[in-house]
UniProtKB/Swiss-Prot annotation:
Name of the encoding gene: nqrF
Protein name according to UniProt: Na(+)-translocating NADH-quinone reductase subunit F
Entry note: cofactor: Binds 1 [2Fe-2S] cluster.
Residues of the 2Fe-2S ferredoxin-type domain: 32-126
FAD-binding FR-type domain ranges (all copies): 129-269
PROSITE patterns noted in UniProt: 2FE2S_FER_2, FAD_FR
Length: 407
């Protein structure tokens, strides 16, 4: 009898707890539809279910806000202005938003929970962002760890981007084995040296990342990206490799790939100032886009130079492109510096790190380096070194433009 009574009491306690939870849920979790008012325009209003994040609700309604980290709160790009209904700003957002901006309603859409009706404000250019399913034209190695992914836009469509802009690319859940990569013989030495073929990328959910475009607006119907494979660092070889780069490197001719865009803010200023471009690694992409746009589309007569840093001759690419532009335009010159040239390179050009080469061979004797505009994109250490050098020369922040892809 005691056992039966104990079972009955336990069951009653469990039922009571369930009822308490259900009651609390009914009070704390909103039910029914909620409305997101956008830019005070009734035609843009979004009706959705509560729960989830604002970024996802906007995407579900076909409004694609830039989010290079895929909604993780780390990139700080998905800024919107929440005028009401967003709740208190979270500590994760304050890493990217100042207290003053927070008072004005600035929020990260990926961190705003959908609990009640909301009134938000979005930049008008957001409504020009679209999504396309593209076809892979080619995906070739341009350097040991860099591929050029070339995508075909669907017939009759176009991506109305500006030079220096970027798109977001989607990777589905996947299992990629590096051993299946087709690495050309000239690049295999380092892959085998660092035992990279042992890696695999196993991902169970969709991922979104941002990449700057290497093509310029008059290269119609295509999107070109320079993608560096994100392998684990040598001092920590057991961490997982990069999700998106692993997926992109697995793509083959004819495969389908979903992108959205265009996005961007790394645009050239409309001035007559001298332009100095500084790049390294996959930071080549926006450099190529900008320089081609200035010289081929705009026929700019501004004085400009391009300084690119590579490890060895094997890591140089688009050489023929820039040689052609230099031959055709008296106002453009370009230089490459190798930090670790190989004996077989027979290199007689600049050597060392690109910030030192730029300073020693040009800016040190420049009559007014502070008057130039500097456009740069490369690995974080390169960016920091170049910016430090420019600051020492008295260059103001407004003349230093950085496409900071974080690596």
């Amino acid at each position: 009898m005691d056992i039966i009574l104990g079972v009955v009491m336990f069951t009653l306690i469990v039922l009571a707890l369930v009822l308490v939870i259900l009651f609390a849920k009914s009070k704390l979790v909103p039910t029914g539809d909620i409305t997101i008012s956008v830019n005070d325009d009734p035609s843009l209003a979004i009706v959705t279910q509560p729960g989830g994040k604002l970024l996802s609700a906007l995407a579900g309604a076909g409004v694609f806000v830039s989010s290079a980290c895929g909604g993780g709160g780390s990139c700080g790009q998905c800024r919107v202005k929440v005028k009401s209904g967003g709740g208190d700003i979270l500590p994760t957002e304050l890493d990217h938003i100042t207290k003053g901006e927070a008072r004005e309603g600035e929020r990260l859409a990926c961190q705003v929970a959908m609990k009640t009706d909301m009134d938000i404000e979005l930049p008008e250019e957001i409504f020009g962002v679209k999504k396309w399913e593209c076809t892979v034209i080619s995906n070739d190695n341009k350097a040991t760890f860099i591929k050029e992914l070339k995508l075909q836009i669907p017939d009759g469509e176009s991506v109305p981007f500006r030079a220096g802009g970027y798109i977001q690319i989607e990777a589905p859940a996947h299992h990629v084995k590096y051993a299946d990569y087709d690495i050309p013989e000239e690049y295999r030495e380092d892959w085998e040296k660092f035992n990279l073929f042992r890696y695999e990328s196993k991902v169970n959910e969709e991922t979104i990342r941002a990449y700057s475009m290497a093509n310029y607006p008059e290269e119609h119907g295509i999107i070109m990206l320079n993608v560096r494979i994100a392998t684990p660092p040598p001092n920590n070889p057991d961490v997982p490799p990069g999700i998106m780069s692993s997926y992109i490197w697995s793509l083959k001719e004819g495969d389908k790939c979903t992108i959205s865009g265009p996005f961007g803010e790394f645009f050239a200023k409309d001035t007559d100032a001298e332009m100095v471009f500084v790049g390294g690694g996959a930071g080549m992409a926006p450099m190529r886009s900008h320089i081609f746009d200035q010289l081929k589309r705009l026929h700019s007569k501004r004085k400009m130079s391009f300084w690119y840093g590579a490890r060895s001759k094997r890591e140089m690419f688009y050489v023929e492109d820039f040689d052609m532009l230099q031959a055709e335009n008296d106002n453009f010159v370009w230089h490459c510096a190798l930090s670790d040239p190989l004996p077989e390179d027979n290199w007689d050009g600049y050597t060392g790190f690109i910030h030192n080469v730029l300073y020693e061979n040009y800016l040190r004797d420049h009559e007014a380096p502070e008057d130039c505009e500097y456009y740069m994109c490369g690995p974080p250490m390169m960016n920091a070194a170049v910016i430090g050098m420019l600051k020492d020369l008295g260059v103001e922040d407004e003349n230093i433009l950085l496409d900071d892809f974080g690596g």
